[in-house]
Every structure is written in C-alpha cells, then in structure tokens.
C-alpha cells in the first residue's frame, strides 16, 4: 500500500470516528449542565 493511501484512510477514519465522538461529548456536557 502507498503511504498516501494509508494517510487518506487514516484521515477518513478520524473524521468518521470524531463525528459521533463530538456529538456524544456535546450531549454529555449539556447533560451535566
């Protein structure tokens, strides 16, 4: 595999994972407030 492909897959995975994480974080903060 090329380094570019690995980098793109890593960035894509980070975006896919960070989406729900940010939503969950906001939900938890609102719940605590």
From Swiss-Prot:
Belongs to the Psb30/Ycf12 family. Its main location: plastid. This is Photosystem II reaction center protein Psb30. GO terms for biological process: photosynthesis. One of its GO terms (cellular component) is chloroplast thylakoid membrane. InterPro entries: PSII_Ycf12_core-subunit. The chain crosses the membrane at residues 5-25. PSII is composed of 1 copy each of membrane proteins PsbA, PsbB, PsbC, PsbD, PsbE, PsbF, PsbH, PsbI, PsbJ, PsbK, PsbL, PsbM, PsbT, PsbX, PsbY, PsbZ, Psb30/Ycf12, peripheral proteins of the oxygen-evolving complex and a large number of cofactors. It forms dimeric complexes. A core subunit of photosystem II (PSII), probably helps stabilize the reaction center. The gene is psb30. It is a single-pass membrane protein. It is found in: Plastid, Chloroplast thylakoid membrane. It holds the Pfam family PSII_Ycf12.
